[in-house]
């Protein structure tokens, strides 16, 4: 981050707003003594890891079915604000540490990670506004010029859709594009062709939480076949120009040591072999949460079997947590981490986790949540950290497209300095 004379935090406001699923979430505004203001909104997940930081909900069934966040908002006004008012907005680490200390719990359950994160991000945005520079430049400095390869979730299943598909996300990745703008166009064209393919087969449905189609299909393999057909129909070469990726979210169908999919139970090794078969049959370059979040020994087997060929991303397994990431590094488990700000709860801890991953040659994928807002922080974060990949949903629903549009603007701002991650080997492991 850039150095600047101290600018104290003067005021903090917070409110309960709605996310993209119509559920309450937290918005915070941080105002500095100079008048600069930063605003941030926090997302929430549908498929959540057991070890994520605590999202504080009211539990009052008379409001939003118990999902209200008025306690989190009150915590910002009554507990967080008094702790950090007059602190230097440019000292992000100290601001975040003060909130962590004020909370005093391992998973932020006292104040709520949703309360802490909203203030953490709003503080960084206020500091960037004070300097009159974009957030990505404030966080990453002058070398922040790499636009990420998008993981576009165009077919939904699992916890993200009301259908009979086991795996949660089937994604396309434009690995052969020359720029982010071109990659986005390719993805949008494939998405449009997918709509046509589904319509022809009388499978066209509404979209899931993240904007992907959610048809009832006979198997997970049928979803991959549909993507291959859509890529071909759009005029692109699968594997060369556009690759496939999956979020299996296997914790959702793991029970009593077995994986239950396609209507029957399977041992961990049978499931690993099934994933291996899919990788051999389709141009899959990335699998997220290939095994359940506490199935560490079998994760090691999965990594040994597939890790040299594709990217194996830990989401529920690692929950943006440096302690769990260090365990994975020590065990040789996975080779990439999904980064979700609200899983850990502060900007500082998020950046520390990304740094730990980078130092140990693990890739980072910056990610949204299924319950999103119009906040575009993750787009700036992807560029600031040179992560090389971003996962922010499909090519429809404005809370998803907002992140893509922000990346288009960043690419335009950078001009000739902009580099598409796939061109310099920062895309998915292949």
UniProtKB/Swiss-Prot annotation:
Transmembrane segments: none annotated. Mg(2+) binds at residues 247, 288, 315. Its main location: cytoplasm. Binds a second Mg(2+) ion via substrate during catalysis. It is found in: Cytoplasm; Secreted; Cell surface. Coiled coil: none annotated. InterPro entries: Enolase, Enolase-like_C_sf, Enolase-like_N, Enolase_C, Enolase_CS, Enolase_N. GO terms for biological process: glycolytic process. It holds the Pfam family Enolase_N. The active site is at 210 (proton donor), 340 (proton acceptor). (2R)-2-phosphoglycerate binds at residues 168, 340, 369-370, 391. GO terms for cellular component: cell surface; extracellular region; phosphopyruvate hydratase complex. PROSITE patterns: ENOLASE. Keywords: Cytoplasm, Glycolysis, Lyase, Magnesium, Metal-binding, Secreted. Its cofactor is Mg(2+). It comes from the Bacteria. It catalyses: (2R)-2-phosphoglycerate = phosphoenolpyruvate + H2O. GO terms for molecular function: magnesium ion binding; phosphopyruvate hydratase activity. Pathway: Carbohydrate degradation; glycolysis; pyruvate from D-glyceraldehyde 3-phosphate: step 4/5. Belongs to the enolase family. HAMAP family: Enolase. PANTHER family: ENOLASE. Catalyzes the reversible conversion of 2-phosphoglycerate (2-PG) into phosphoenolpyruvate (PEP). It is essential for the degradation of carbohydrates via glycolysis. This is Enolase.
């Amino acid at each position: 981050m850039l150095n600047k004379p101290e600018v104290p935090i003067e005021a903090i406001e917070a409110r309960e707003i709605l996310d993209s699923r119509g559920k309450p979430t937290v918005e915070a505004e941080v105002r500095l003594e100079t008048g600069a203001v930063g605003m941030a909104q926090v997302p929430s997940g549908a498929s959540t890891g057991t070890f994520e930081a605590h999202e504080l909900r009211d539990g009052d069934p008379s409001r939003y079915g118990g999902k209200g966040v008025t306690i989190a908002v009150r915590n910002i006004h009554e507990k967080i604000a008094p702790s950090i008012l007059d602190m230097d907005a440019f000292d992000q680490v100290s601001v975040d540490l003060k909130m962590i200390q004020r909370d005093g719990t391992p998973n932020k359950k006292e104040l709520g990670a949703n309360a802490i994160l909203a203030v953490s991000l709003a503080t960084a945005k206020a500091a960037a506004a004070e300097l009159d520079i974009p957030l990505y430049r404030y966080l990453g400095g002058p070398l922040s010029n790499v636009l990420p390869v998008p993981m576009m979730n165009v077919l939904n299943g699992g916890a993200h859709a009301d259908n009979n598909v086991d795996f949660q996300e089937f994604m396309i990745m434009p690995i052969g594009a020359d720029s982010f703008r071109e990659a986005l166009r390719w993805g949008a064209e494939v998405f449009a062709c997918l709509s046509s393919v589904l319509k022809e087969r009388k499978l066209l449905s509404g979209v899931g939480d993240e904007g992907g189609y959610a048809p009832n299909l006979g198997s997970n393999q049928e979803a991959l076949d549909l993507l291959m057909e859509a890529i071909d129909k759009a005029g692109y070469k699968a594997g060369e120009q556009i690759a496939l990726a999956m979020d299996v979210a296997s914790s959702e169908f793991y029970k009593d040591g077995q994986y239950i999919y396609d209507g029957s139970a399977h041992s961990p090794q049978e499931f690993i072999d099934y994933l291996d078969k899919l990788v051999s049959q389709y141009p899959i370059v990335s699998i997220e949460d290939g095994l359940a979040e506490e199935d560490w020994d079998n994760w090691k087997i999965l990594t040994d079997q597939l890790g040299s060929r594709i990217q194996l991303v830990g989401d529920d397994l690692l929950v943006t947590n440096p302690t769990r990431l260090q365990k994975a590094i020590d065990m040789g488990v996975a080779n990439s981490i999904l980064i979700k700000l609200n899983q850990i709860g502060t900007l500082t801890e998020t950046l520390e986790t990304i740094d730990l991953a980078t130092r140990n040659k693990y890739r980072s994928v910056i990610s949204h949540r299924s319950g999103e807002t119009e906040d575009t922080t993750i787009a700036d974060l992807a560029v600031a950290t040179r992560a090389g990949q971003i996962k922010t949903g499909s090519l429809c629903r404005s809370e998803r497209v907002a992140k893509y549009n922000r990346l288009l603007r960043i690419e335009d701002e950078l001009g000739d300095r902009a580099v598409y991650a796939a061109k310099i080997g920062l895309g998915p492991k292949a």
